[in-house]
Every structure is written in structure tokens, then in C-alpha cells.
């Protein structure tokens, strides 16, 4: 372990893992709610729409909340067909009304059967049979017989489950990634961080417990990737799922129980301090 690096990053975690930074971050969207299902729905949606400028992301999420009458869970469960008309013009970048309506359809069928979105990632029963995105039948054994589920298993399961409704729009598949596609799954890993981490600092929610903080994979976006490479936490040339795993394994050397807390440090250095864009980056 590099003690100097750990000390430096721990200081940066303390600097950026604070409620003062919530307002300007997409995590502010689920923080608008107290009902668990509203937090899950808008946390997932905010993470999905999290590309581009943060001001725009937050603005579009607030627009979506307004279109759902300020109560996403209630709207999704109780809406009637005419209620969906006002959503037909919602768009953020390549996310459009077709995607919006499918998200609502998925959430409705899920919450009619489960109390929490957590079951969409780690079902309560040992194995689940469902129609996968190619229309064939698969069985997902979620490692609960031999041990705890992994994030990789959970994300691969989630994508197949998410697109298990009949006649799902194929265009929407680009908005939900998975490790099996070699994606870093940055947005989904960020969402899982929000739902799972439990440091009581008031940023992450800690409303899920089937996955542990030690299981999480660090979200790896352009800014985190740039900083992590300078710190030699990433050596892999390409940026894919294995890159996110490599980064997380390096962070586990600093804190094996909560490696993803360093997302605050890496992201803060990349965005707030513009490491790699402005100024001189120290060596460790």
C-alpha cells in the first residue's frame, strides 16, 4: 500500500463526501424524496440521464419529476393511459419519449410485484427464470447458494430483467449497460453507490443491504479515469468493465471494506480541481 496516496485520497474523500456538494450533483435528485421507492426511481433515472453538464442533468430530472406530478412512484403505479401524453415530448440528449414510456412500464410491472428496486438487481429467491433480451429462456443463478452475489452478476441480471417485458423498444437498450457488454457501467455503478454505501455522511442513502459496500465497483467516467491513470491505479490501455474492476482492486488496497468511497476523491480531483486539465499533478 502507498501510505502517502492513501493519506492524500482520504483527505480528498473528507473534502468532497459532504452534503454541501449535493446541490450541484445529480444525487440531489433522489435527495428530493423520502419515500424509498421515489428515491430508487429518481436515483436510477438521474444516473441514467447523467451525461452532459450537471446543471442540465438536474434541470431535466426536475422537469421529469414535474411531469409525474411531483410523486414518481404514485404516478407510475396509478397513472392511466391519458396521463402519459404529457411525457411524449420529454427528451435528454438521445433519451426520448419512447425510452421514458418504457421506463415507466418497467417500473410499474416491477413495483406491482416487489417493494424495492433492489430485487431487480438481486432477487430474493435463489434463481429466477425470465425471457432475456433475445427472447430465449435463461436461468440466472445468483450465487446465493455458494456465497454472496457480485455486482457483475447483479448488473448482468438486471439488464436481462429490465428488457424482459414483451415488445420492449430495442433503441432503449443503449441506455442500460452491463459487464457482459464490456461496458464500465459507470452510471449503474454510481446508482449502486448511492443505494448501498452507508457512511452516514448524508450523501449516499444506504437503503439497500443485499450488496455490501465492499462489493461495489467504482464508477469510472472520463474524469475518474484520467485521475486514476495518473495515480497509477489503472494500467489497462482500454476503458471497459475490467478497467473499472482494476481500479476498484487498487482502491481496495487503501480500504478493503469501502473502496468506492474514493470515487468522491477521484471525481472531485477531476471535476472540481481539474486534474490533468489545469495545474500540476503531484506524484506518489
What role is predicted for each listed range?
Residues 1-284:
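HhH-family (HhH-GPD) DNA N-glycosylase catalytic core used in base-excision repair
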Amino acid at each position: 500500500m502507498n501510505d502517502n496516496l492513501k493519506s492524500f485520497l482520504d483527505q480528498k474523500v473528507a473534502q468532497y463526501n459532504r452534503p454541501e456538494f449535493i446541490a450541484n450533483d445529480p444525487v440531489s435528485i433522489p435527495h428530493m424524496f423520502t419515500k424509498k421507492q421515489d428515491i430508487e426511481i429518481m436515483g436510477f433515472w438521474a444516473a441514467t440521464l447523467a451525461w452532459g453538464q450537471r446543471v442540465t442533468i438536474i434541470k431535466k430530472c426536475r422537469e421529469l419529476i414535474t411531469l409525474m406530478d411531483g410523486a414518481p412512484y404514485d404516478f407510475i403505479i396509478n397513472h392511466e393511459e391519458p396521463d402519459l401524453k404529457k411525457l411524449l415530448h420529454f427528451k435528454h440528449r438521445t433519451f426520448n419519449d419512447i425510452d421514458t414510456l418504457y421506463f415507466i412500464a418497467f417500473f410499474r410491472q416491477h413495483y406491482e410485484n416487489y417493494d424495492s428496486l433492489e430485487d431487480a438487481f438481486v432477487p430474493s429467491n435463489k434463481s429466477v427464470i425470465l425471457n432475456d433480451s433475445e427472447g430465449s429462456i435463461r436461468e440466472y443463478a445468483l450465487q446465493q447458494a455458494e456465497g454472496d452475489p457480485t455486482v457483475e452478476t447483479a448488473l448482468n441480471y438486471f439488464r436481462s430483467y429490465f428488457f424482459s417485458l414483451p415488445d420492449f423498444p430495442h433503441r432503449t437498450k443503449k441506455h442500460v449497460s452491463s459487464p457482459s457488454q464490456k461496458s464500465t457501467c459507470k452510471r449503474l455503478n454510481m446508482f449502486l453507490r448511492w443505494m448501498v454505501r452507508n457512511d452516514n455522511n448524508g450523501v449516499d442513502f444506504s437503503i439497500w443491504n443485499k450488496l455490501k459496500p465492499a462489493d461495489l465497483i467504482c464508477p469510472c467516467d472520463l474524469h475518474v479515469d484520467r485521475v486514476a491513470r495518473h495515480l497509477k491505479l489503472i494500467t489497462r490501455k482500454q476503458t471497459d468493465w475490467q478497467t473499472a474492476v482494476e481500479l476498484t482492486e487498487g482502491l481496495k488496497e487503501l480500504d478493503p471494506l469501502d473502496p468506492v468511497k474514493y470515487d468522491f476523491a477521484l471525481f472531485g480531483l477531476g471535476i472540481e480541481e481539474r486534474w490533468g486539465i489545469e495545474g500540476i499533478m503531484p506524484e506518489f
